[in-house]
């Protein structure tokens, strides 16, 4: 997962495609309720860089995550937390903000950002193996080590089969166990912070990392074995899936729900900042315009920003009439599938 700023997590081409996909789904999105989690088949690769936009309305959420990471009363304990919320609510941006917080950077080493979606081909690879390799790469482990582990595992399984020995472990399970051991050694005695962004069911990453090994169980069977305890390690997940979130942590209070913004002024600031970034004239910010934006975006920061990127909203009735639109809205908003919407540059 690259640490470089590629338009803050998206390449320029990716942003164009992403904005077009947003336009294609906009009418459908407006019809969903606030309680629904929008599951989109398209995912994007993210990185640890600061979001390329200001964050508004999440002051309390930022303080809550700072407390989770910097609480001196639980300095040595391993703790995990899930940020769960619907598509576009700002989970990734919130975690990027806290990941780069000055005090957090000074308190944790190493800090590793894992985008659960990768643009690299994973065809035929196990989800757990891919994630473990990503973490280990962030710790400086080279590809040659992974090749060596895989080669030794395949050879061991082959030799056992030829000798008629069966130990109940598949080659994949042995490889995962070896990677967990390597991870444990690299994280041992370190106060680490790992963020798993956009965890979904298909990733096959659905175990509690603070689970303890039961008596008689073999080490390396569970993901938790790879994450040392006792040095103050922290893990943060983001996910859209409420049920998956419950599988990732032990206690309910370890689930942090991120809701759409209820403060219409914060939503307007998000929209206005994007308009100004694109050097466009801001619409008047009277109550009618703010309420209309709140209704269209449903309080979702991503929706507010992309509405501005799609060059959609002319709230001024006079300007709207000059452009031949109705009720102060342009055709590109009423029909975001229009060619005008799809060809807007970013």
Curated annotation (Swiss-Prot):
Binding site for ATP: 85-92
Domain of life: Eukaryota
One Pfam family it belongs to: NB-ARC
InterPro entries recorded: NB-ARC (IPR002182), P-loop_NTPase (IPR027417)
SUPFAM superfamilies from the UniProt entry: P-loop containing nucleoside triphosphate hydrolases (SSF52540)
Molecular function terms, GO-annotated: ADP binding; ATP binding
Domain NB-ARC: residue ranges: 38-116
GO terms, biological process: defense response
Keywords: ATP-binding, Nucleotide-binding, Plant defense
Organism: Arabidopsis thaliana (Mouse-ear cress)
Keyword Lyase recorded: no
Protein name: Probable disease resistance protein At5g45440
Residues covered by region (Disordered): 315-346
Function field: Possible disease resistance protein.
